[in-house]
Regions:
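Bacterial signal peptide processing site
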Residues: 26-28
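Low-complexity, glycine/alanine/valine/leucine- and proline-rich hydrophobic stretches
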Residues: 415-465, 472
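A long, amphipathic alpha-helix that forms part
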Residues: 30-33, 48-51, 197-223, 230-272, ...
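Active-site-proximal alpha/beta segments of enzymes that process anionic O-linked groups
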Residues: 49-218, 231-232, 483-488
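Long, internal low-complexity/basic segments
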Residues: 33, 399, 469, 474, ...
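C-terminal motif of bacterial Sec signal peptides marking the signal peptidase cleavage site
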Residues: 21-24
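Secreted, luminal/periplasmic, and some membrane-associated catalytic domains
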Residues: 42, 57, 81, 103-133, ...
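Beta-strand elements within well-structured catalytic alpha/beta cores of enzymes
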Residues: 34-51, 64-65, 89, 130, ...
Length: 558
């Protein structure tokens, strides 16, 4: 059936989306055995731009979900970074249980780091839970899912996956994607350069075609697809301009959303979500400079930060970390800067027995954390204090997987971006502003199971996994820290909750992989290949690096 005129396609060609009336007959729906859940991720989307576009009528498919369903502001992890946020979202627990905090994890008994992978997640994601229970599931483009793991359907890894192959299972499906010209990651983690608009559009078309084919099959009950290109473009050109490149890409994603809803069919609950938002920051705070100026970190005499060298970030960032550690006197550095994103930063004490060159006695940790927290709270720029919150990571991110986690996480005033820079300049101004992550993402949902609600709720990103399982009437784990949000249902029902250890179907990652070393070997081969291409240089300008942004701090959008 044709849609109302507001649903006609932009840019000169028309399309008819058989968008189901997602709320129709929902009151009578009581059988959950055949309902499906489609989760679409728009990486980096925030209501600051979504709401004006909805009001302008340029996102008709998303507007239908809003009018028939409900919305929630989705608070990201602290810090708001895609690796931690998406992993926590689909595992239902925070970084203290997943072990994923940033894009790198420390090597034991070393000051070096390595790029994370899907095996860095110590918590079972929903696709493993569902597959272990025999539920069909497709996963397409979710960050930090490489190496791909076998699921009861198709798994196509997203951000951090290599372009050459080894990113999808079954292998026959990967060959089909390669023949179509598909690339799993458009950012600069595995590539020398960012994609232009033409390249983005080409990949969107390929991804849309592949997803429409998958969703048109009847062998799945849950499908998750993330569109990372929005984050990649936002790191370059984010603005609130409704005619800007990010807004135009959102319009394209809305059209694709209509195609995917049509392919999924009428008995499908649809969730459109993001891992964080975006904004422009007119000022920066160099965390390394703060630590040096307050005598928490000491430099080796005569050393200077090395400048950035071109190459994939998967290698450039670890090289930069090694160069940075070489430039520090670790025997005298009591605290070290860790991940920074948006107006959030993190720090870690250099503890003996935990850090390879630690200088802080474990007995000193409580006292020094208190002093470091006070120094952060006392930090002033232009006569005004700029740190608004400081958290102990053990309280903010409880859990046993703490190898990659900091000791303190802090938040600054909204216009001050925290960076891990050269350590020379504490504070810099960027009149045009620099694009980076914001804390709050989006959740927009509608479907036959979901009751409409006009008031916007507040959720945590960890709520997504439990809520998806509850929509499918699947048992939840007692260990989940996220909420299942049963209040969104037309007919609320109590959740089925079991301890993880009492789920006889659940398999570990090694059991899922079947003991195969294929993916481990692929990772080793990939890193050797990149090194042989000369991408082993260092990167000194980490203060300007977002998750896919190679610009230097002084550059402005053209």
């Amino acid at each position: 059936m044709p849609l109302p005129p507001t649903f006609l396609q932009r840019s000169g060609w028309r399309f008819l989306v058989l968008l189901p009336l997602l709320g129709a007959c929902a009151e009578e729906a009581t059988d959950h055995s055949n309902n499906k859940v489609l989760v679409i991720g728009w990486d980096g989307a925030g209501f600051e731009l979504i709401d004006p576009l909805l009001a302008s009528g340029r996102l008709p498919n998303l507007a239908r979900l809003v009018s028939e369903g409900r919305t929630a502001q989705l608070e990201s992890t602290r810090i708001p970074i895609s690796s931690a946020a998406w992993t926590s979202a689909f595992s239902g627990v925070g970084p203290g249980h997943t072990g994923v905090f940033g894009f790198f994890e420390p090597l034991e008994d070393s000051s070096d780091v390595q790029l994370i992978s899907s095996r860095s997640n110590h918590a079972p994601p929903i696709w493993r839970i569902l597959s272990s229970r025999g539920v069909g599931v497709h996963v397409f483009g979710v960050p930090v899912t490489w190496p791909a793991e076998p699921v009861q359907g198709v798994m196509v890894a997203g951000m951090l996956a290599p372009h050459e192959g080894g990113f999808a299972l079954p292998e026959a499906y990967e060959q089909r994607l390669l023949q179509m010209g598909f690339v799993p990651d458009l950012g600069v983690w595995r590539s020398n350069s960012l994609p232009d608009a033409k390249r983005v559009q080409e990949q969107l078309a390929i991804k849309e075609k592949a997803l429409v084919e998958l969703l048109g099959q009847d062998n799945w009950r849950c499908a998750v697809a993330v569109f990372k290109s929005l984050d990649v473009i936002s790191h370059q050109r984010y603005s609130a301009n409704l005619d800007g490149p990010v807004a135009k890409l959102l319009v394209d994603l809305d059209r694709i959303l209509g195609s995917l809803i049509q392919a999924a069919g009428p008995n499908t609950d649809v969730l459109v979500v993001s891992d964080h938002g975006f904004r422009r920051y007119p000022r920066t705070l160099d965390l390394e400079a703060f630590l040096i100026q307050n005598n928490w970190t000491q430099r080796n005499p005569g050393t200077a930060p090395e400048r950035r060298q071109a190459g994939p970030l998967a290698l450039a960032r670890p090289s930069a970390h090694r160069a940075r550690m070489t430039g520090l006197d670790l025997d005298a550095s009591r605290a070290l800067a860790m991940e920074c994103e948006g107006n959030f930063g993190s720090l870690r004490l250099n503890v003996i027995g935990r850090n390879s060159q630690g200088c802080v006695e474990p007995s000193q940790v409580p006292e020094l954390l208190g002093k470091l927290e006070q120094d952060l709270r006392n930090l002033e720029i232009d006569g005004k204090k700029v740190v608004t919150q400081v958290w102990r990571a053990t309280e903010l991110m409880p859990g046993p997987k703490r190898l990659a986690l900091p000791d303190l996480v802090f938040e600054t005033v909204p216009d001050l971006r925290v960076v891990l820079g050269s350590g020379d300049i504490l504070h810099a101004r960027l009149p045009a502003g620099f694009p980076d992550h914001g804390l709050n993402g989006i959740a927009i949902m509608a479907g036959p199971s979901i009751a409409g609600e006009t008031q916007r709720a507040s959720w945590s990103v960890t709520d997504l996994g439990p809520t998806i399982l509850h929509l499918l009437d699947q048992p939840l784990y007692r260990e989940f820290s996220g909420s299942h949000h049963g209040e969104i249902l037309h007919n609320p029902r109590p959740p089925k909750v079991i301890p993880m250890e009492q789920d006889p179907t659940l398999r570990s990652r090694s059991q899922v992989d079947g003991g195969s070393s294929r993916s481990n070997q692929e990772m080793q081969d990939l890193m050797r290949a990149l090194e042989s291409m000369g991408y082993a240089g260092s990167e000194g300008d980490q203060e300007v690096q977002g998750e896919g942004d190679p610009k230097t701090q002084g550059e402005e959008d053209q």
